[in-house]
Amino acid sequence: MRNPTLPKLTSQGLELDTSVESFGLLRNSMDVIEDKVVLRERMSEDGYLYLPGYLGRDLVLEARMSVTERLAAEGLTDPGHSADEAVAHPDSGLKFKPDLAHDNEPLHRLLYGGRMMAFYERFLGGPVRHYDFTWMRAVAPGYGTQPHGDIVFMGRGTHNLYTAWTPLGDIDFQLGGLMILEGSHRLQSLREEYLTRDVDEYCENVEGEEEYAKTNPDMHGWRWDGSVSEDPVELREQLAGRWLTAEFRAGDLLTFSTYTIHASLDNRSQRIRLSSDSRYQLDSDPVDERWIGEAPVGHGPAGKRGRIC
């Protein structure tokens, strides 16, 4: 069913049920931004905190400009439009472009200083460290991100770890922002199976698996891409809850736990959807070694780990 007040929304090419029973808007938590106790209670209850306007629009737009200028210089935007519009060059095929964060001072200032770090220090209650790797999304028109939880990509350190999804510009329903599956962080069925997995583990007792994991460049040597489902419509029907999203603006912050299932709407515009994922934890907690250092090993060969299957 479709809510008549909303446009047609799709994810993975599938039309979402936008009836009030299946779809909703994220809860705004700016009313309790100074109350760390309530913020923690809401994170525990909702699995996310949506903070519209918290980061400040000017700082975000400065970071956006640094990104769009690089895209234009690489010929990835349409030269018939200004770089800031980020109109996609035909067949650019963009999705994930972490090099946009390399030596990017405006972006690092936004994500790893000021109000962002102040928020996590207050929320977590102590000195905070961030992962050194920045996940930069530059999503061309087409499908968005499949449903997944972050823990399967970064679960070797503390699980008291939080993602900051930061829209680098205004993202309406057509451009297609992130969506959260309501209540998914509390589902025992996911915690006992899907959320215990690690995309970089391989079966060391199976012949050929170590070589495949460490040498096959296709999909980082994965046998599995970390998604919980390829079908966000069917997944919601199976797990219940609603898909929750918003029309985001530059300056908004959406943070969530590593157990929270999330995905994104498809990009049904002509523009590139720009956003970043960055991660934060207490400095005193153990950290996943794949994502720290000047050149994090990430999902490369050094990040693989064998187990007995």
Each model region followed by its residue ranges:
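Non-heme Fe(II)-dependent double-stranded beta-helix
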Residues: 2-46, 52-149, 153-156, 290-291, ...
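Catalytic core of non-heme Fe(II) oxygenases with the double-stranded beta-helix
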Residues: 118, 145-245, 285-294
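Short, solvent-exposed loop/turn segments at secondary-structure junctions
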Residues: 55-57, 136-138, 171, 185-186, ...
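Non-heme Fe(II)/2-oxoglutarate
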Residues: 1-29, 62, 77-82, 193-199, ...
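A structural signal for short, well-ordered beta-strand segments
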Residues: 132-133, 164-166, 276-280
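Short Gly/aromatic-enriched secondary-structure transition segments
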Residues: 65-68, 180-182, 270
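Short, charged/polar surface micro-motifs in flexible loops or helix N-caps
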Residues: 126, 139-142, 171-173, 253, ...
